[in-house]
Amino acid sequence: MPSISVRRLFDDNQYKLQLAWAAGNSGADNRIGVEADKPVLALVGHLNFIHPNQIQVVGLAESEYLNRLESGETGYQFGDLFDISMSLVIVANDLPVSPGLRDYCHKNDIPLLTSKLESPYLMDVLRIYLQRTLAASSVKHGVFLDVFEIGVLITGHSGLGKSELALELISRGHSLIADDAVELFRIGPETLEGRCSPMLRDFLEVRGLGILNIRHIFGETSIRPKKILQLIINLVEADDEYMKQLDRLSIRTETESILNVNVRSVTLPVAVGRNLAVLVEAAVRNYILQLRGKDSTREFLERHQTQLKENEQNHENRPD
């Protein structure tokens, strides 16, 4: 199961969530991970001794209860209630940290952080962060682009011209997200997000030209940090025989399964004289039309059937 350390969570969210260490620094390497019987959203919650979360957040009500606990009003001790499995405690709302809580976290190597933000907002941000960070992931070979605001993954065997095609699309105003190794994360039941590793960000390798820094050549708008994957365009090498056998009126919808998510796919034959950049743009425009309920192939076939019926009726009504 994927997991991250408390140290990484702190580094990634220190400024956004105004986090600061209060105790338990020795537990910075504690792991926060997905459990088989719990969704990611259940990792974070207000202080709960019955159904404890890995990240326990102390808000106004929880802070008041801890103060009563420390004063002896409840008849319980800290050790009686805190003998639970947790990776991190965050005191929100800029509240003072209870001395008893600080001592307990220090003795048991449980990281204790503070935040000036209100607890509901804090938990919402952490849930979104953990959902993205702990998402199931896979790496696909290809070039990932933003074409007309649609995330398009171009795949195919080496040497078919994927990078050259990507370069032409970028020169036409579209944006590069990742080249060669596209990192895909399932951030929702039916949603894949594509990203680029920090090592490869901004770069595109083109045979004969070497490695190009797309951001420096084409400007800031030529690069996108991430995008939802919506369409896969698979390039295949085609000869005359392949082109003859190609179904030119196919109404089947092709999909490819990645991380148990079905993604719409289109196969484009690569042959001499074909303008692939124009074909990719047309495929994306056609996909957008289909999202709006318009299918050109079905529309043509319906028109064809209507014309045949009209011709048949005219033939029957024609006097001998």
Swiss-Prot record:
Residues 269-274 are annotated as: Important for the catalytic mechanism of dephosphorylation. Transmembrane segments: none annotated. The keyword Cytoplasm does not apply. Mg(2+) binds at S163, E205. It catalyses: [HPr protein]-L-serine + ATP = [HPr protein]-O-phospho-L-serine + ADP + H(+); [HPr protein]-O-phospho-L-serine + phosphate + H(+) = [HPr protein]-L-serine + diphosphate. The keyword Transferase applies. Belongs to the HPrK/P family. PANTHER family: HPR KINASE_PHOSPHORYLASE, PROTEIN YJDM-RELATED. This is HPr kinase/phosphorylase. It comes from Neisseria gonorrhoeae (strain ATCC 700825 / FA 1090). The gene is hprK.
